[in-house]
Amino acid sequence: MLIADDLEKLLEILPHFVREPLKQHSNRKNLIEVVMDLGRRPEARFPGNPEYLSQRSISWQDLDYCVKKVGNFSGDNRAGIEKTLHRISSMRNREGSIIGLTCRVGRAVFGTISIIRDLLEQGDSILLLGKPGVGKTTAVREIARVLSDEMEKRVVIIDTSNEIAGDGDIPHPAIGRARRMQVAQPDLQHQVMIEAVENHMPEVIIIDEIGTELEALAARTIAERGVQLVGTAHGNYLESLIKNPTLADLIGGIQYVTLGDDEAKRRGTQKSILERKAAPAFQIAIEIHDRKAWIVHEKVEETIDQILQGHQPFVQKRQIQDNGRILIKCYPSQSTEVLSTNSSSLQKMSSLKQKTHFLQQREVKNKTFDLNKLENRDTSLLSTTINTPVNINNHSFQVEASIQYLYAYSLSWQHITSVISALDLPIILTKEIEKSDAILALRSQVKQNTKLRQIAKSRQIIIYTIQNSTVPQITRALRKILNINTSSDLNWVKLCKSKKFYEIQALQEAKLAIEIIILNENSIVQLTPRSAYIRKMQHNLIDNYQLRARSFGEEPYRKLRIYPE
């Protein structure tokens, strides 16, 4: 990477007792900013730790000396040094007098976005997320140069604080052929964004620091006009935008949706859920946690949907190694590789997983097929399994063996106790709904009892319903609560041993269909056409799960259809 920082021009505006120690400092190439507060010693901040530069305190005269050497401060208390990328920010007292300065070093780092160059070539809108000082503006500046010079696109930069292209009327060469639009007042940024589209015919618009609801709305308007957007926002994780009502529109917005009784039961969720409101303004989101390691969400739409449903999406970690090579890895968000940078998300997802007891996601060829997303009650499955390597692993579906506390409402305790004893299930009945992990009730009683539904909703407890208080229905419900049917007693490795590839593929297809039926009690799943010998193998597997199957159609298109119990 080539770095240009014009550090000497920044040092020229500093008082001599601040400038001289920095000139002689061995680590000045890594200087982040210089902080000068009235009545305090000057401080230099480096990536490792801050250091005091002098024993002398900053006076009014020292601050006035610096202010006179920089441009005028704008409405957001920012100024700059002409033809440089440095930013000078001021702190004022109640009378409006400057009592502190933050002199931040601006650097043009050429080659820093090689890690995401393939994403730029796709033409999708990109949102960069990260805490202050992590390098978002530096990355945006280099993106502007690459898009305008190397990809020859018409690029317009909305430079509200003159931080991307520097202070003055002539933009810094680091942005290449990109054009820069300055903003007279920071609160008018959204108007300048719309003006850029209407007047200057850009192919790409670059915005730094989207922070208000009007700016988020303007970004959405620009995206709907077919212009590629590259923007930055403060926030460590993509989940931060979901919780931020001001910026939620950037990822499509979040809304409460009330489901019908049947739909809520089929999904295994409460009736009131969160869903994405519209298509996101940015198709790609990048979390910058470190200057050399970025986490990429290539499909924001799918990632947001998975997060709202309580699933753990796959994340893509891109890292620049010491030899300059780029290492790209894909992990579930629960991976230890991203644990240090996504701990808050992990805690939220793990708690959801413990409460809902959903099936674990199944990984096939580095992709995750979420069985809860297959909503059609009569569907063909092989579109997800044809020409896909089969993962033969007897631990691919695990049953949670922890003890579950069950609250039974309007049901016979004697019947439930007899089923638990006969099957030796890890379930304890409780009379306190607050301590329960699940609720089992008659369907007719649940519809009439709004208080029960409210308590379950507030405590995030799933209500399992049955039609009648019979032993078979209670048995099926208890098995569903424990996900017992998701793991057969069959030894999967032994079953597939000495089988040919197409035979294993057919068994894998049947197994996936069985799990869909277990999740959606009323589902009917149709398999793809197979020979009589293969259909017999599938029949034997289905019988082991105590489900019904029937062949229909004419040869050679005869196939199985699997029914619930």
From Swiss-Prot:
SMART domains: AAA, R3H. It holds the Pfam family Spore_III_AA. SUPFAM superfamilies: P-loop containing nucleoside triphosphate hydrolases, R3H domain. Keywords: ATP-binding, Chloroplast, Nucleotide-binding, Plastid. The keyword Plastid applies. CDD domains: AAA, R3H_AAA. PROSITE patterns: R3H (PS51061). This is Uncharacterized protein ycf45. Belongs to the ycf45 family. ATP binds at residues 130-137. It comes from the Eukaryota. PANTHER family: KINASE-RELATED, P-LOOP CONTAINING NUCLEOSIDE TRIPHOSPHATE HYDROLASES SUPERFAMILY PROTEIN. InterPro entries: AAA+_ATPase, P-loop_NTPase, R3H_AAA, R3H_dom, R3H_dom_sf, Spore_III_AA_AAA+_ATPase. Residues 503-565 form the R3H domain. One of its GO terms (cellular component) is chloroplast. GO terms for molecular function: ATP binding; ATP hydrolysis activity; nucleic acid binding. It is found in: Plastid, Chloroplast.
